[in-house]
Amino acid sequence: ASYEALGGFVRNWPGKRIGVIGGPGDRRDEDFVSLGELAADIFDEIIIKEDDDTRGRPRGNAAELIYQGVEQFLNQGKDFDSRVIYESILDETSAINMALDRAPFDSLVVILPESVSRAIGLIEARNPVKDLELSESNLKSSKSSEELKTSIVH
């Protein structure tokens, strides 16, 4: 349900939509297949990664199931953009970096990370919001400086 809610937002993005997707290894096989189907319906480009901790699954198995779901959706013949690009890059850091490298100016990159702090670090290392300054006047015009800071981080 949470992925479908995310999809409602992402589908309306006017630029390129790139997803770095994966999930914890202790999920059911059909959950991974469903994630792949949903991703194929949402994104223009999909990079399938796996968590470092596969939670008992053989390395590559969860990604294989997600890949299967992407292919199942694309082979259904529904009304979709046949130019969906998808691939597996199992290492989360490599997958995130590849998505960020490929993202044009107006794109949206959605990352479903195992390690949120690692993902944020990779994004921050690229200085994506160079010109944004939190000046005193910006903070004073806001109801709350904490609200403003939170909205910029999220």
Where are the regions a protein language model picked out?
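ATP-dependent carboxylate-amine ligase
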Residues: A1-H154
